[in-house]
């Protein structure tokens, strides 16, 4: 049976012997680790142990499983470790095992203590005389990445780097020392902070405050109010710019397109571009398109406005039904070869084939 435990009280060795007792075992091996009173000429008063309890118990159980896989005759295994302050001469760890023969017990205990020092997350702190802080110690058996023996020796590198470079003053934009540069950065940050604060006051603070109150220490965090703007879901002010001239004023100027066409099309100021356009462009083609699109035809209307109406109608139809443009089949040109027609062959059943063969036989015999 496995007995694994982390204790805060002194470990009872007699209780350990009771856990190992078994009628079929002829040997019991017990290792007891205690606190010594010196280390490298320093007087040790006590040891302080800390552990990651759940992980430590898990690893200790794994050690027991490893012991039983290597030594199959082990009967009982005990691993007790003490936490907290452990004075001199008191036991901090006890590892014991019982088996029918002494070799398995001795070898398993030696293997277990090495694995405990290597794998279990328990940390030790030595308290010295005259030093209340103490010093954390590392087990020499703990697994740590070894330093590479083939490390690069930078001291033997023949490369030399020139540290002094003369930079032309024309390439230096800021010619101040570190203190002045730090001062400028702080001033810039403070100014930006003040701008943000002032904007927050404008956007968040209520303007309906009595003038007799001192507002020097007020802020948006303590006096914030949300003023809903008209026709808006946001409390911030939204402004719309109305241009006094340009395409946005076409509704206010009915003759804007006509004036623009005259301005862009007239050369000598005497010819009418609309009449010239009517003469050059066959009006019948546009009328056919308008009738196909279901639009009313007005020959007196500007040609560009009529084309624009057709384009808007196409966009409307495609937005309502995106597959609209796929419904119109383009007629093939006379130059293009007509695609071959697919002829579906008739499939015959077995009875029809038998009857057909029989007719052929009857005809041959008849002939």
Curated annotation (Swiss-Prot):
The entry's keywords: Cytoplasm, Molybdenum cofactor biosynthesis, Transferase
Enzyme Commission number, as recorded = 2.8.1.12
* Residue ranges of coiled coil: none
Under the heading InterPro entries, the entry gives:
MoaE_sf, MOCS2B_euk, Mopterin_biosynth_MoaE
Functional pathway: Cofactor biosynthesis; molybdopterin biosynthesis
Main localisation: cytoplasm
Q: What are its GO biological-process terms?
A: chromatin remodeling; Mo-molybdopterin cofactor biosynthetic process
Q: Where does substrate bind?
A: 101-102, 117, 124-126
Q: Which GO terms describe its molecular function?
A: molybdopterin synthase activity
Looking up Pfam families in the UniProt record yields: MoaE (PF02391)
Q: Which domain of life is it from?
A: Eukaryota
Protein localization: Cytoplasm
Q: Which reaction does it catalyse?
A: 2 [molybdopterin-synthase sulfur-carrier protein]-C-terminal-Gly-aminoethanethioate + cyclic pyranopterin phosphate + H2O = molybdopterin + 2 [molybdopterin-synthase sulfur-carrier protein]-C-terminal Gly-Gly + 2 H(+)
Describe its function.
Catalytic subunit of the molybdopterin synthase complex, a complex that catalyzes the conversion of precursor Z into molybdopterin. Acts by mediating the incorporation of 2 sulfur atoms from thiocarboxylated Mocs2A into precursor Z to generate a dithiolene group.
The entry's family comment says:
Belongs to the MoaE family. MOCS2B subfamily.
Q: Which HAMAP family does the UniProt record give?
A: MOC2B
- Tell me how this protein assembles: Heterotetramer; composed of 2 small (Mocs2A) and 2 large (Mocs2B) subunits.
Remarks, miscellaneous: This protein is produced by a bicistronic gene which also produces the small subunit (Mocs2A).
Protein's UniProt name = Molybdopterin synthase catalytic subunit
**Gene behind the chain:** Mocs2B
């Amino acid at each position: 049976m496995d007995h694994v435990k982390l204790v805060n009280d002194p470990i009872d060795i007699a209780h350990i012997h009771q856990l190992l007792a078994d009628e079929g075992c002829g040997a019991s091996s017990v290792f007891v680790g205690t606190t010594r009173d010196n280390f490298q000429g320093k007087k040790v008063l006590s040891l302080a142990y800390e552990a990651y309890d759940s992980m430590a118990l898990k690893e200790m159980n794994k050690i027991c499983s490893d012991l039983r896989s290597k030594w199959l005759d082990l009967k009982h295994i005990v691993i007790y470790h003490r936490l907290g302050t452990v004075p001199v001469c008191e036991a901090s760890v006890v590892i014991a095992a019982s088996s029918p023969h002494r070799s398995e017990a001795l070898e398993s205990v030696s293997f277990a203590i090495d694995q405990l020092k290597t794998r279990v997350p328990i940390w030790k702190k030595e308290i010295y005389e005259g030093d209340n802080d103490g010093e954390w110690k590392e087990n020499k058996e703990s697994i740590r990445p070894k330093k590479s023996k083939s490390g690069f020796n930078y001291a033997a590198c023949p490369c030399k780097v020139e540290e002094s470079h003369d930079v032309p003053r024309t390439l230096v934009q800021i010619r101040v020392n570190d203190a002045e540069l730090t001062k400028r950065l702080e001033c810039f940050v403070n100014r930006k902070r003040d701008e943000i604060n002032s904007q927050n006051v404008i956007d968040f603070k209520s303007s309906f405050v009595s003038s007799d109150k001192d507002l020097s220490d007020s802020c948006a965090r303590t006096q914030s109010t949300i003023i809903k703007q008209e026709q808006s879901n946001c409390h911030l002010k939204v402004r719309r710019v109305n241009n006094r001239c340009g395409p946005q004023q076409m509704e206010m100027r009915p003759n804007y397109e006509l004036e623009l066409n005259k301005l862009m099309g007239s050369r000598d100021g005497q010819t009418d571009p609309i009449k010239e356009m009517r003469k050059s462009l066959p009006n019948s083609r546009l009328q056919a398109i308008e009738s196909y699109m279901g639009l009313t035809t007005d020959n007196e209307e500007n040609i560009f406005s009529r084309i624009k109406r057709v384009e808007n109608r196409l966009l409307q139809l495609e937005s309502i039904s995106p597959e609209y443009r796929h419904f119109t089949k383009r007629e093939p040109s006379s130059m293009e070869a007509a695609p071959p027609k697919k002829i579906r062959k008739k499939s015959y059943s077995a009875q029809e084939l038998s009857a057909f063969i029989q007719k052929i036989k009857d005809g041959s015999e008849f002939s």
